Every structure is written in structure tokens, then in C-alpha cells.
């Protein structure tokens, strides 16, 4: 057996990989093991499995998403622990890039073999490897760097299911809630609803008792042993939680015992706003536990006092460290308790009311989960900040990270490519030069001043570091060209830049006269449209800098007319004037993005507008008017006739909104897009290709129309893509918002949905070499092409993705659920061929 296969078996015995992991499949290759270990997460867990607490998993990045910076940090953490804890010599270790770039995977296997023979590893009783003679064929490792370059990791697997118990504190919570069960009367089996109500009441009572015990048995005795700063750091806002839950417990008890639970739904709705103080608690609980650990190690008197307090509180069963995690568990249970109650409520009015309470508690749970997730992001950002030299600005101001990695850059007036490492955020790109394990900042690019454009001509060179795209300055200053190592990496970078730019300039940011911009809200805030909370700790949503309206990204298009159309009116929020090269920009330099209206009837000035309004604006049917001022209740609006340039007032019923013209999309970087092409040329392209090879072409005789050409049963078939009302479709029963969505959907679903005789999916893009498509299919295996569907859900709300891992939803979307493992309230699923993560509280699962 080859060494890499023996290594995989050893990792399974160490409980790092599950027994059915893809490295055990008959089709498995050394590539699969390399890809699995490449981000360093499993290696860190391996050391913890061999000796507990070798590495603090809170200090590594459990979801590095193949960020080069975060993966290398994980790998270096593993290598350091191999020396310091396992006594290995540096000469026995691989280098970080040997694994990340798989430039010497043989050395990685050798290091793991030596690790398996260390005294600590042998003490576990697990046999080291290799256990048998094997031919060490170095040739199998030679092609790995190229293979890694060709294959981007999709976020498709529950890779860390067996690794890390994110549900920290869950067992403690369950133990505490069950402690009183023996003393409670049993619920009748035929009345599950009564059981649900009893559980809500009893667990609230027990939880309040737990909070009170923290206050009585830990806070009061420890006050004289800790400094004020230490005390606040450990106990955060527990006194506020105690007061809150005493009141909540009383109201729940009163509703269930005295009012036949008729107002229970209202209790939870009323308390949603008050329960958001859990955001503060959940933000601080991790550092509270770290502070407690540090104080216990450095102050012997505190350590002894903690043990004494624990014995008095619960006979030593639970430590303060255990109990600090319980509040985070409780606040995430309310929606689950209400969900059960709704399920077993039959009265239509009661059910509808309880659903309102359920929505409120789901919103609260998602808010808390996003606070937790943002705390992970802030830890990443802090690591970036500490590793980049000469960086004097707080990285936090640049928004959330979208990706990082190596790239080559030229300015558009020079042609020398410079090797750089870039960190891409929502609002900026930090361009760095790598210096050992750290980075030297060379430039910060403000993305608010740029737009992105593909350079399709570079794709024809077909060699490494030749795949380019442009970053173009919107005010005509010198731009940049970025070069990527492979075509796939270029596609990924383009998507990440486009996502960042869509966060800066989202659709509908200026609709209804608004001026919405990404914003960090210092107080808990709700969306003006859906009334749900803006979630997280920074850049939670969008603020109109004219009227102060607040909204989610997905809700921007549904905000009512701006209350301050004229930016000079009282109460308007103003942005500081932007300057370019020290000169104030004139209005002509900026596209104000004002709404455009189409004139539907002539207007020559009769009837005239009111005298105090101003002069009439003459219009001809078909003219386009730029709307300057007006609201839904005004008889006359002010605008500029783009044909004459004149400004004046006109009847509001003389115009209608201009039809939305979608921006032209550049598909040239897609491996399936052929550009303008006729049927005969398409048939020539496909004639010598395998069946299910396809292309999408622009039909030259029909402007704006597309067609799919696919080889099926050794013949080229052609399918016209119909466009109507802004949607694309080949079958009337399934429509898509973009050509990209349509192609993605039919990659996974047979074309027979629209054409009975055409039973195939879109499998092989015609630009992709046949061998690479085949290899990728073989490596992926059937299970990745067809993930196991755990259930079906319906989207209850719109959701707009903030990065490439997330899945945008529209209300009513049917979602296939693939994963529910995330403890942060996110599930993984598919909508119309698009796969990604979405908030579980935004969907309702079919029973």
C-alpha cells in the first residue's frame, strides 16, 4: 500500500477523518488527501486528538475558505506545536508551502510518519505508519501542484463534522434543564401541546435560577478577589440578564398558568427588543472565558475561590467556566421551543399569533448567531492587521474580507508584472509584498473609486500568470491590471471583486431618491422594510445619508420614498465632500443616479404648475425625463428633459418609469460562452467532442438572443433561450434571472424538463480540455455531483449574499437542504443550480 494511503488510514484511526471519507474510495488519489489537509485545520485537530489541548482551537481558523493567509497560519501553528509539544526537530518538518502549494507532498507524508512514531503518538496505542514495506513512488507527487492549481475547492463538504464540537456548553445546558425533571409531573401523552407549554415554563424557571446562582455564588464572593476590569471582563452584563429573566419568567408563568397562554405570543414579541442585550453577552463570552482561564492560572487565591464557589453552587458539578456558556445556549432555544408549540397548535388564530412570536425569536437567534460569526471575522481581521507591516489604518474600516492570495499586478501605463499578495475587503484592496511569514503593505486601493472589467484577450495565451482583468478608476486616473495563475483563479477573483463592489454599490441603493451606503450601526437597529434586526457587529446594513432610513441589502428596493429628497433640507444627513487631487468634484463629474422617467403623452404647459413651484417643462411623448423632485401625492413633479436639457415642472401622470434595461453582462470568461456564433459553426466546434459537451452562443441574426448547442447521441442539438420580462428560460415552467443561473441549473438537472427527447445535463463546457473535465468528474465522484438532500424548504424572506460562500434567496424559492451541521444557524443548500450557505431562520422546512 502506498505511503499516502497508509497515512490516510492512520488519520482515520486517530479519529481525524471519518471512516467513509473520500480518501477511502476506490477512485481516491493522493490529490484527495492533499486537498483535505491543505488548509491545516485537520492537522491542528490531529495534535489535539493525540494530546488534548496541544493547540487551542479558538486560536486557529476553522473555516479558512482556502484563504492563503489563514491556511498558512494554521499550518505554521501545527508545525510549531510539533516542535514545542511533540519534541520533533525542525529538520523533520515540512515547510508551510510544501503543503499549501503541495510542492513537496512527499515531505508532508514523511513528517506525519515521524509524528506517528513520537512517544506521545505511540502512547495512544495507535500503530504508526508505514506498517508495511511500500514503494515510495515520488512520481505520484510531481503533478500535484498543477492539479491543485486547476481545481478550486468548493465549500461543499462537512469537512469538519468530526473535528470540532461547536455546540460548546450544549451538554451543560441540557444537564441543567433536566436536573429538575424527576420532580415534575409527567405530561399526558395525548396532549403534546401541554408538554410544550410546560417545557417553556419550566426551562425558563430553571434558567433564571442558574443566572441567579451565578450572581449569588460567583459574582458576590469574587468581587473582592478581582479588579473592576477583570470583574467586568468575566461577568459582562449578567446582572442585566438576571433582571430581564426574572421579569420574563414571571410573565411566562402568568400567561400559561393564569391566562391559558392566550397572550404568550405577545410576551415573546414584546421581549424581542429587550433580549438583544444577548448580542453584548455573546460578543464578550469568549474573551470572558479566556480572561477567567488566565486569572485562574496567574492567581492561586482566585483559583481556590472558584473551586469553593463551585462546590457551594452545585456541589462542584459545574464550574463558572461551564456556566458562562449557558446563556448563549438559552437564547438560541426560544425559537425551537416555540416551533414545537406552533406544530401542535390547531386553533388557526392561536397558530397565526404564535407564528409571529416564532418569527421574532428566529430573528433574535439569527442576530445572536451573526454576532458570533462577526466575532470570528473580527479575529481574522485582527490577524491580518498584526501581520501587515506599515499598515496604520484599522482594517476593520474596510469591511468584511472577501479573499486573499497571490496575484501579479501592473499599472496600465507600465508593463512590468509585480508579484504581490492582496487582501480583498468590501471597501478596499490592501496590496502587499510577502516578507517571510509577514507582509509589507505597498498600497491601499479604495474600491469606492473603481470598477472591474474582464480582459478576455489574456485567456488565449493559456499559460500561468497570463489570465488578466482590469481595475478601472471611475474618474479617469491610472488603473491596474491583475494577472492570475489560472483561468479558474481568475474567475474566482472576478466573482469576489464583483461581490465586494455589489456591497459598496448595491442594486437599488439610490431607488426612490435614497442614498444608501454600507454602515456600522453602534446601536441595535431594525430594517425599515421588514422590521427584522440588522445583524452582526459591524457593517450590519445600509443607511440612507439623506433621510436616515436603515435597511438590509435585500430590502433596499422596497424602502418608501426618501423623506428628504432635497439634500439641503433640515434633518438631512450629509456626507463629507469627496475630493480628487485636492479639487472638489463638479456635479458634471458625478453621475447622480437620478430616476429616469419615460414621457407617455405630450405636455405643452397647460395646465400650468402652481406659481410657487416654477416654470412648466414642455414634453414630447417618447422623451426621457430625469426626475429631480416629486412624491406619489404631488400633481406636478420637477425634472430635466434629457432631449432639451431644460428643467421645469410637469404633470406626474404624463410619465411612467423607464423600463429597466439590464446591464450588459460579460460572459467571455465563462468556459461555455462562445460569443457570436451561427449553428453551423457550433456544430463544427462540437463534432469531435464527447456527448454532453455544450456551448452557449449569441445568435447573430437575433440581437440579444442566445442559444445552447449541445452534443447528444452524437449529434449537435440547438435550444433557443427565450427572454421575456427580464427572465431567461428554455421551458415556460422554469425561469431564471440571468443566463448564468440558467446554465448552472441545467448543469445539475436534465434538459428533458423542456425537451422530452433530450435527457442530458450540461456537462462539459466546450472550452475545457476533455481530459481535465474527465479527471475532475472522476475525482469528484457521484456523491459530490449529487449531494444527499436532507430536506426541502421554502424561503420565507429575501436574502442577499454578502460573499461568495452565501446563497441569495427570493421569497418563495424552493431550497434543497444539503447540510444542517453549522452551529451558527446557517444551512447549506441549492436553489436553481446555485449552491451555498443561507440563514436557517429564513426558510421553513417542509414537514
Swiss-Prot record:
Pfam family, one: SH2
Tissue spec. comment: Isoform 1 and isoform 3 are widely expressed; both are expressed at very low levels in skeletal muscle. In keratinocytes, isoform 1 is less abundant than isoform 3. Isoform 3 is detected at very low levels, if any, in adrenal gland, bone marrow, spleen, fetal brain and spinal cord; in these tissues, isoform 1 is readily detectable.
Modification Phosphotyrosine occurs at: 141
Residue intervals of the DH domain: 192-371
The protein's name: Guanine nucleotide exchange factor VAV3
Stretches assigned to the PH domain: 400-502
GO molecular function annotations of the record: epidermal growth factor receptor binding; GTPase activator activity; guanyl-nucleotide exchange factor activity; zinc ion binding
Organism whose genome encodes this protein: Homo sapiens
One Gene Ontology cellular component: cytoplasm
Ranges of residues in domain SH3: 592-660, 788-847
Protein's UniProt keywords contain Hydrolase: no
CDD domains documented for this protein: C1_VAV3, CH_VAV3, PH_Vav, RhoGEF, SH2_Vav3, SH3_VAV3_1, SH3_VAV3_2
Zn finger (Phorbol-ester/DAG-type) start-end: 513-562
GO biological process: angiogenesis; B cell receptor signaling pathway; cell migration; DNA damage response; Fc-epsilon receptor signaling pathway; Fc-gamma receptor signaling pathway involved in phagocytosis; immune response-regulating cell surface receptor signaling pathway; integrin-mediated signaling pathway
Keyword DNA-binding: no
Function: Exchange factor for GTP-binding proteins RhoA, RhoG and, to a lesser extent, Rac1. Binds physically to the nucleotide-free states of those GTPases. Plays an important role in angiogenesis. Its recruitment by phosphorylated EPHA2 is critical for EFNA1-induced RAC1 GTPase activation and vascular endothelial cell migration and assembly. May be important for integrin-mediated signaling, at least in some cell types.
Posttranslational modification: Phosphorylated. Phosphorylation can be mediated by ROS1. In osteoclasts, undergoes tyrosine phosphorylation in response to CSF1.
Induction: Down-regulated by EGF and TGF-beta.
Residue numbers spanned by region Sufficient for interaction with ROS1: 560-847
InterPro entries cross-referenced by the UniProt entry: CAMSAP-like_CH_dom, CH_dom, CH_dom_sf, DBL_dom_sf, DH_dom, GDS_CDC24_CS, PE/DAG-bd, PH-like_dom_sf
Keywords noted in UniProt: Angiogenesis, Guanine-nucleotide releasing factor, Metal-binding, Phosphoprotein, Repeat, SH2 domain, SH3 domain, Zinc, Zinc-finger
Occurrences of domain SH2 (ranges): 672-766
Complex and partners: Interacts with the PH domain of SH2B2. Interacts (via SH2 domains) with the phosphorylated form of EPHA2. Interacts with ROS1; constitutive interaction that mediates VAV3 phosphorylation.
Record domain Calponin-homology (CH): where: 1-119
Amino acid at each position: 500500500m502506498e505511503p499516502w494511503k497508509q497515512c490516510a488510514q492512520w488519520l482515520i484511526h486517530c479519529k481525524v477523518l471519518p471512516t467513509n471519507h473520500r480518501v477511502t474510495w476506490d477512485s481516491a488519489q493522493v490529490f484527495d488527501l492533499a486537498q483535505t489537509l491543505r488548509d491545516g485545520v485537520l492537522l491542528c485537530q490531529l495534535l489535539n486528538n493525540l494530546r488534548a489541548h496541544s493547540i487551542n482551537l479558538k486560536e486557529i481558523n476553522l473555516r479558512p475558505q482556502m484563504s492563503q493567509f489563514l491556511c498558512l497560519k494554521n499550518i505554521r501553528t501545527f508545525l510549531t506545536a510539533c516542535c514545542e509539544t511533540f519534541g520533533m526537530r525542525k529538520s523533520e518538518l515540512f515547510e508551510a508551502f510544501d503543503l499549501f502549494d503541495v510542492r513537496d507532498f512527499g515531505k508532508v507524508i514523511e513528517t506525519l510518519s515521524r509524528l506517528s512514531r513520537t512517544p506521545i503518538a505511540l502512547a495512544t496505542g495507535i500503530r504508526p505508519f508505514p506498517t508495511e514495506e511500500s514503494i515510495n513512488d515520488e512520481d505520484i507527487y510531481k503533478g500535484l501542484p498543477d492539479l491543485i492549481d486547476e481545481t478550486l475547492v468548493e465549500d461543499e463538504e462537512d469537512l469538519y463534522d468530526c473535528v470540532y464540537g461547536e455546540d460548546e456548553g450544549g451538554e451543560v445546558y441540557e444537564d441543567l434543564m433536566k436536573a429538575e425533571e424527576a420532580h415534575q409531573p409527567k405530561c399526558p401523552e395525548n396532549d403534546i401541546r401541554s408538554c410544550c407549554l410546560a417545557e417553556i415554563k419550566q426551562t425558563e424557571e430553571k434558567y433564571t435560577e442558574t443566572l441567579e446562582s451565578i450572581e449569588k455564588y460567583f459574582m458576590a464572593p469574587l468581587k473582592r478577589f478581582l479588579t473592576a476590569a477583570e470583574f467586568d471582563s468575566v461577568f459582562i452584563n449578567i446582572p442585566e440578564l438576571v433582571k430581564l429573566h426574572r421579569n420574563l419568567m414571571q410573565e411566562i408563568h402568568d400567561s400559561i398558568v393564569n391566562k391559558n397562554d392566550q397572550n404568550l405570543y405577545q410576551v415573546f414579541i414584546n421581549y424581542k427588543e429587550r433580549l438583544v442585550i444577548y448580542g453584548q453577552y455573546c460578543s464578550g463570552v469568549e474573551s470572558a472565558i479566556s480572561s477567567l482561564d488566565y486569572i485562574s492560572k496567574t492567581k492561586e487565591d482566585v483559583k481556590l475561590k472558584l473551586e469553593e464557589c463551585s462546590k457551594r453552587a452545585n456541589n462542584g458539578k459545574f464550574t463558572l467556566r461551564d456556566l458562562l456558556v449557558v446563556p448563549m445556549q438559552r437564547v438560541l432555544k426560544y425559537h425551537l421551543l416555540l416551533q414545537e408549540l406552533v406544530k401542535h397548535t390547531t386553533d388557526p388564530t392561536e397558530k397565526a399569533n404564535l407564528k409571529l412570536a416564532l418569527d421574532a425569536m428566529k430573528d433574535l437567534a439569527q442576530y445572536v448567531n451573526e454576532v458570533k460569526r462577526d466575532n470570528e471575522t473580527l479575529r481574522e481581521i485582527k490577524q491580518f492587521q498584526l501581520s501587515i507591516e506599515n499598515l496604520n489604518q484599522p482594517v476593520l474600516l474596510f469591511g468584511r474580507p472577501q479573499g486573499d492570495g497571490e496575484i501579479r499586478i501592473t499599472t496600465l501605463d507600465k508593463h512590468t508584472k509585480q508579484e504581490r499578495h492582496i487582501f480583498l475587503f468590501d471597501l478596499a484592496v490592501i496590496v502587499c509584498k510577502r516578507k517571510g511569514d509577514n507582509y509589507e503593505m505597498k498600497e491601499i486601493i479604495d474600491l469606492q473609486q473603481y470598477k472591474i472589467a474582464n480582459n478576455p484577450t489574456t485567456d488565449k495565451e493559456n499559460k500561468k500568470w497570463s489570465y488578466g482583468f482590469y481595475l478601472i478608476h471611475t474618474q479617469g486616473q491610472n488603473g491596474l491590471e491583475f494577472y492570475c495563475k489560472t483561468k479558474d483563479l481568475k474567475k474566482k477573483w472576478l466573482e469576489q471583486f464583483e461581490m465586494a463592489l455589489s456591497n459598496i454599490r448595491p442594486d437599488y441603493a439610490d431607488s426612490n431618491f435614497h442614498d444608501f451606503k454600507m454602515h456600522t450601526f453602534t446601536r441595535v437597529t431594525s430594517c425599515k422594510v421588514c422590521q427584522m434586526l440588522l445583524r452582526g457587529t459591524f457593517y450590519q446594513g445600509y443607511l440612507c445619508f439623506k433621510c436616515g432610513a436603515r435597511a438590509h441589502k435585500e430590502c433596499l428596493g422596497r424602502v418608501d420614498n426618501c423623506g428628504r429628497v432635497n439634500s439641503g433640507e433640515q434633518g438631512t444627513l450629509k456626507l463629507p465632500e469627496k475630493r480628487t487631487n485636492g479639487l472638489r468634484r463638479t456635479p458634471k463629474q458625478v453621475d447622480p443616479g437620478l430616476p429616469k422617467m419615460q414621457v407617455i403623452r405630450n405636455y405643452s404647459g397647460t395646465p400650468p404648475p402652481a406659481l410657487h413651484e416654477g416654470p412648466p417643462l414642455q414634453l414630447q411623448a417618447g422623451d426621457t425625463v430625469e426626475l429631480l423632485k416629486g412624491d406619489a401625492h404631488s400633481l406636478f413633479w420637477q425634472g430635466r428633459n434629457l432631449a432639451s436639457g431644460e428643467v421645469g415642472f410637469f404633470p406626474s401622470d404624463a410619465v411612467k418609469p423607464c423600463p429597466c434595461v439590464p446591464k450588459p453582462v460579460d460572459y467571455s470568461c465563462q468556459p461555455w460562452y462562445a460569443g457570436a456564433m451561427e449553428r453551423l459553426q457550433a456544430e463544427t466546434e462540437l463534432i469531435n467532442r464527447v456527448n454532453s459537451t455544450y456551448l452557449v452562443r449569441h445568435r447573430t441574426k437575433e440581437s440579444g438572443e442566445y442559444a445552447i448547442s449541445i452534443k447528444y447521441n452524437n449529434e449537435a442539438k440547438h435550444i433557443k433561450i427565450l427572454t421575456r420580462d427580464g427572465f431567461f428560460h428554455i421551458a415556460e415552467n422554469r425561469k431564471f434571472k440571468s443566463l448564468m443561473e440558467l446554465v448552472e441549473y441545467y448543469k445539475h438537472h436534465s434538459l428533458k424538463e423542456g425537451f422530452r427527447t433530450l435527457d442530458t445535463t450540461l456537462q462539459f463546457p466546450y472550452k475545457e480540455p476533455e481530459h481535465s473535465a474527465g479527471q475532475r468528474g472522476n475525482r469528484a465522484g457521484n456523491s459530490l455531483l449529487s449531494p444527499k438532500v436532507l430536506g426541502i424548504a421554502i424561503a420565507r424572506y429575501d436574502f442577499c449574499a454578502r460573499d461568495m460562500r452565501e446563497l441569495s434567496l427570493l421569497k418563495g424559492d424552493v431550497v434543497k437542504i444539503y447540510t444542517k451541521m453549522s452551529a451558527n444557524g446557517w444551512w447549506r443548500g441549492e436553489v436553481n443550480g446555485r449552491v451555498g450557505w443561507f440563514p436557517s431562520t429564513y426558510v421553513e422546512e417542509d414537514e
